[in-house]
Amino acid sequence: MALTVVGSIAFDAVKTPFGERERMLGGAAVHFSLAASFFTEVRPVGPVGDDFGEEQFELLRSRGIITEDIERVPGGQSFFWRGHYDFDLNVAHTDDTRLGVFETFEPKLSAAAEAADTLFLANIQPDLQRQVRAQCAAGFSGLDSMNLWIEIAKDSLEAAIAEVDCLVVNDAEIRMLTGEANLAKAARAVMKMGPRAVVAKRGEYGAALFTADPGTEADAESHNFFALPGFPLEDVRDPTGAGDSFAGGFFGYLDGVDGDLDEANLRRAMGYGTVLASFNVEEFGTERVSRLEREEIDERFEALRRMTQFEAVPAPRN
């Protein structure tokens, strides 16, 4: 199996109450690819500038990530984001954004990227997401977005959502997109647009999965619902990229099981997404995930499974 992801490949400068870093490797496609690489062959697509050196390429290649579709633009500068977090790590404050070569990005997939079994469209302009989707005949596709595109390009975003199988956004964004305060109603509204699955990311509180059975209408009776909490951690240093790491674990696992999208696999994918996100936040940027071992992932997955299950024992009656 093979997975293509299209999105930002960047440098980040981040300050939290627990430390700070200057110009560390980041971007949605990077965090996604590192997480997905534990399960499948992953190929990120995106532009970088001359400032993206061999050190950054080698970090990705050391994880088996195929870098042939990362386009280095001569004379250009890579996407750069500077932000900070206060003690509420659920809220990122943007201090500076420099699009660099990403401003003129026109995605053109290689033959290998087009042939991927799974496609993930990270948070980029919706019209670009549609351009990529038209180039790739992947059997399973997903999309992430943000409040900016809901505000300024809602029609284009809804058209892009209609062309994918799974929408992955945070709970505030899905409510904003649909105008529904209730999360279940909001997910149902999204599924009426086309996707058969909706994942609502909820930060430190975990994630919720809504799915419709194949061949059924998007009504309440046909919905499946599953939710997991965030993995409990005593030390959280930097949440940047956690949502992308979640998506990488989720889609990477599904591609690794040959795209078998039954309900059981979707729920296991939620578990692996949750686990990868939990490792991501333990240190800054890619520091933790880039040296993570598969055994650590499986151990934490099993710990998460144990802490979220209970026996169905009838309650005593008075």
Which residue stretches match the model-derived regions?
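Extreme N-terminal starter segment of soluble prokaryotic enzymes
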Residues: M1-T4
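Active-site metal-binding loops of divalent metal-dependent hydrolases
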Residues: G7-I9, S245
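Conserved N-terminal subdomain of the carbohydrate kinase-like
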Residues: F11-R23, F38-F120, A134-G139, D298-N318
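Histidine-anchored nucleotide/phosphate-binding helix
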Residues: G27-S37
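Short beta-strand scaffold segments in enzyme catalytic cores
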Residues: L34, W81-H84, G206-F210
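Short, conserved phosphate/pyrophosphate- and ester-handling motifs at nucleotide-, phospho-/glycolipid
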Residues: A36, N170, G243
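Conserved beta-alpha-beta core of the PfkB/ribokinase-like small-molecule kinase fold
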Residues: T118-R188, Y205-G206, A212
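Conserved phosphate-binding/catalytic region of the ribokinase-like
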Residues: A184-N318
